[in-house]
Amino acid sequence: MPVRQLPEQVINRIAAGEVVERPASVVKELVENAIDAGASRIDIFTDGGGRRKIAITDDGGGMTAADLALAVERHATSKLDDEDLLQIRTLGFRGEALPSIGSVARLSITTRHKSEPHAWGITVDCGDKSQIVPAALNQGTRVEVADLFHATPARLKFLKTDRTEAEAIREVVRRLAMARPDIAFTVAGEERAPVTWAAALPGAPGQLTRLGDILGTDFRSHAIAVRSERDHVAVEGFAAAPALTRANALGQYLFVNGRPVRDKLILGAVRAAYADYLPRDRHPVVALFVTLDPREVDANVHPAKTEVRFRNAGLVRALIIHALKEGLAREGRRTAANDGGATIAAFRPAFTPPRPSAGPMNWDWQRSPSAPIPRHDDVDSMPPAVSSAAFAEPMQAAFDVGGPRADLRLHEQPAAPDMLDRPLGAARTQIHDTYIVSQTRDGLVIVDQHAAHERIVYERLKTSLAAHGVQRQILLIPDIVELDEATVEALLARTDELAAFGLAVESFGPGAVAVRETPSLLGKINAAGLLRDLAEHMEEWGEALPLERRLMHVAATMACHGSVRAGRRLKPEEMNALLRVMEETPNSGQCNHGRPTYVELKLADVEKLFGRR
């Protein structure tokens, strides 16, 4: 077949295949045009998931008759001149949207510029343009799209259900509305109640108001303001505390110069910033806005303009991580999933009262036997409070190791008044040799002793690594650990990373390694269990994971093995010392795996459980 020039109509339909993927793509292009036109209000109406009808009305600048005639031609735009392609400042710039839509649907445009005595209208039906005629409309533009893809019926087969396509449209509008809280949006149609987002005040308060309207009150109550700036690149926005997470990354909204994007670089930076706070299967909720010189970012790398390319991607990534980490650290205890709401909701009545009966009750409280509650033998000799120095010691010899118990012991030790005013209060008891119950001035706190100490050890390992290196203890007799060949190879390939944390490992013949040094901070540890866990994690990492993240994984695994275990009995002074160190430790609200280290219940919550409120 000889080479030939394609007809203009076929060219437009090919272009439409890149620009108009589904009804949501049409809405995105048209709403972006309205935003670029300076609209303060945009109304969106759809029917049949956008297949039957899409109508978008704005109060922007509108177009003259001459501009309207050019607007439906390919590559005709008012947003770009010969020198602007490398410094794009508008959402749209290619001039492809309207002719592409008009080539696969019935397009109708009515518009009025303030300089015109009346509005003008034009229709485009599968590429066939009508004459421009006078029309009725106030200042602004109304664009209607009917029978989408009726010129290319094969494309209809790839669309989802009306409900799915309608939800995709709403998601597009949500993202655009987040970026412009100063514009009012209304989404109607699909036999659903209209959704309206009123224009908000400028600045961070207005931004948070709009985000709360879209993402819900949970996000607003958990939102943490973040900001970082360097070399004319600014990152700001709001990030949810780790108490609010999702099972996927769909709750991460990213914007570059006001443009909603899906960028793997930014998503990776968000994940890295939350790595110390969330379990691997949970994802944070954030809305981040990156602002930089348009010449430093290329927005012309994707047909749908949903991806960008940064000139200095490393700087953008570093600023995002710094902004999020600084915000999470600044909020301190608020970042923990420690509120008692979910805890209260999980409570159930301990028993169902028996129905009244004619016969006598066969259970007598006074005659019912009861076992005495076991206590520490030395409870009377315990001091009322101790400093956190006991927990600051590297070794954990102060802990009395014991087997798991399912008892509940009460330490009737009066707490110093000032301890009740501390954030985590005064320790009152330990239950199941795993949880510490403390009393505060207005409630109580339940602490997971292993999770709490794990975070403390982890933060100390990180601090030591950043400052002067982790102190080591040389073993008089090296621990010989037998492992399979693959595990040995994985460990020996990372000896430098392990050495950074004070773990000296070397080969000891086939299928074995010798551990000659361990971190002093961990005290006596189960070297075999630690090495097996490290090897398993290393197999997952691969070479793609940055060295910094690999080191943090090593630290987290070591902290888990070097922390006080569940099932270990603690003395009152040890429990109080742990609480005091928690109050001084960054990020102590979560363990290294993202689980909460404590839950706080206010007295009012407890009173609700018993019907006192």
From Swiss-Prot:
Function of the protein: This protein is involved in the repair of mismatches in DNA. It is required for dam-dependent methyl-directed DNA mismatch repair. May act as a 'molecular matchmaker', a protein that promotes the formation of a stable complex between two or more DNA-binding proteins in an ATP-dependent manner without itself being part of a final effector complex.
GO CC terms of this entry: mismatch repair complex
Domain of life: Bacteria
Family annotation (SUPFAM superfamilies): ATPase domain of HSP90 chaperone/DNA topoisomerase II/histidine kinase (SSF55874), DNA mismatch repair protein MutL (SSF118116), Ribosomal protein S5 domain 2-like (SSF54211)
Keyword Zinc-finger applies: no
Swiss-Prot/TrEMBL keywords: DNA damage, DNA repair
Protein name: DNA mismatch repair protein MutL
Matches recorded under InterPro entries: DNA_mismatch_repair_CS, DNA_mismatch_repair_MutL, DNA_mismatch_S5_2-like, HATPase_C_sf, MutL/Mlh/PMS, MutL/Mlh/Pms-like, MutL_C, MutL_C_dimsub
Similarity comment: family membership: Belongs to the DNA mismatch repair MutL/HexB family.
One Pfam family matching this protein: MutL_C
PROSITE patterns on file: DNA_MISMATCH_REPAIR_1
GO biological process, one term: mismatch repair
Entry's Gene Ontology molecular function annotations: ATP binding; ATP hydrolysis activity; ATP-dependent DNA damage sensor activity; mismatched DNA binding
